[in-house]
Amino acid sequence: MNSTSIRKATTEDIDAIHRILDMEPFKYDDNLPYERSWIEQLVLNERCLTLVYENENQIKGFISGEKLISGAIMIWFCAVKAEFQNKIIGIKLYYEFEKECKSMDINAILAYGYKTSADMLDRLNFYSSDATYREFYKPLND
């Protein structure tokens, strides 16, 4: 069966999420980037929202952010396995993330973009300056 879902991440997804980060631009050396404990916090901490894109019993991408005291949420990651990039998975994750944020009364989404993620954030109507490494902001008012 070819079932696809975007859902909240669970404890069982932590290793798959961690392995997705084992690629550019997240990788700095030959080691698996980021401590597993940090990925655990993104999944288990109630201040965080982590969604996974699952298809054919495989996690192909995820998006994760953390609620800030200001009422906004900061996106830490939106990553899709290299072999599944440019197949609208990232866009679908962003749309579902925004929908979840609105249901949680989050007032804005903050994100940093570089290279391809910056282009996608532009298409999703985030605001930014024109610097190479760009900070994005999107208010979530109806």
Protein language model features and the residues they cover:
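Conserved acetyl-CoA-binding loop-helix of GNAT-fold acetyltransferases
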Residues: N86-K99
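Conserved GNAT acetyl-CoA-binding A-motif
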Residues: C101-Y114
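Short hydrophobic/aromatic beta-strand or adjacent loop that forms the aromatic wall/cage
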Residues: C48, D130-E135
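Beta-rich extracellular carbohydrate-active architectures
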Residues: V80, K102, F126-Y127
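Conserved N-terminal entry element of GNAT/NAT acetyltransferase domains
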Residues: M1-E12, D142
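A short, internal acetyl-CoA/4′-phosphopantetheine-binding micro-motif in the GNAT/acyltransferase core
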Residues: C78-Q85
